Amino acid sequence: MEHKRDPKRYHTGINDNLVPLEPLDLSKINDFDDMLRAQSLTAFGGRTVGEAVDTLFEMASDKDTFVILTLSGAMTPAKMGLLVCDMIDKGYAHAVVSTGALITHGFVESSGGVHFKHNPKMSDLELYRKGYNRICNVIELEKSLDDIEKIIHEVLDQFDKDAVSSSRILTKALGKWLADNVPGRGILKSAYFKHVPVYIPADTDSEIGLDVYLYMIRSVIEGKKPFGFNPFLDLQHYAELVNQQKKIAIITIGGGVPRNWAQQIAPLLELIQGRLPKGKAPGHIHGIRFSYGLRICPESVNWGGLSGCPYSEGVSWGKMDPDGTFTEVLEDATVVWPWIFKATIQRFEKNGLTIQKNFELKDQLKRVNELMRQYKLA
């Protein structure tokens, strides 16, 4: 069948409700919000970065939306830690799911340690001999890791050895230590003051995990009772917290385990409803899917990894609302995350708005603790 265009039937774009693009006019740009708002009316990656501000602003403005921030990649030695602090302090994030390494390097900085620029003239063998651990073009001192091991063991000394712990309990305790001993800012310190839980699903895959393991082994060698550690307590706590929400959103920095662990909550709640014995499944559990998502990660979808898969793939798993609002920025987070977040902050300020939510996180956490006492995982 031959297809021909009829010039008499050409559309104008406007009659199909297409949005006109606009030239980027630097003479009209006064701040980050102006720049990214203008970029949202351009094309390609620039447009996506601009649209990311729209999505972040919308999820933060939605009074019923609980936001989960997931973190992977070396964001803290890359000096992005204060962005996380601000997202917690300003109410953009109500729960954090992170790699253990990211929390480890952040704790180094929070407790007074310093990261350095890597000198490419130094070989990796030379770095090893001098106690310089390389993370791409950043140096983490082995001495700094030794220093935080002492702090972690000091904190663990205060744990009730008859109780069962988890990563959330440990990160809260470390946040309290920072609050009691360090004047500066820190991710775990902000989380402690704002009652934001911090989960580390792959907690053994990090320096903090190794420190906890060494503490437990040393306890056994010294004839002391090691405390119990159950990662399923984190999953249960997170499930009960998310289950209380009307709507949920996810901000994905990178991908990996934190992203999947956070997203799988939707099918988990569905499985609890459908697969536990009838009459014995928790009656208060309800289904929920993510209504908003903002992902900043350069990984391509064709590699097949979770870090690169689009949110739309999550619809097939029952994780994402097919009618939700999602933006994915395929860029290095250290480049665009500060722009996106600063532009969103400015947009709130310019409109005379603050983040207001219809829930009190502290009250919800109290309810979670009450519900968890009904189970025997601990």
Q: What is the role of each PLM region?
A:
Residues K79-L82, F107-G113, L210-L214, A262-I265, ...:
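Short acidic, glycine/serine/threonine-rich loops at helix termini
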Residues P201-I248, P258:
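Active-site rim loops that border cofactor/substrate pockets in soluble metabolic enzymes
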Residues E126-I208:
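Ligand-binding beta-strand-loop-alpha-helix segment within the catalytic cores
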Residues A52-F66, S190-Y192, A239-K247:
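Glycine-rich phosphate/diphosphate-binding loops that line cofactor/substrate pockets in enzymes
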Residues V84-E149:
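A generic, well-ordered mixed alpha/beta core segment in the N-terminal half of proteins
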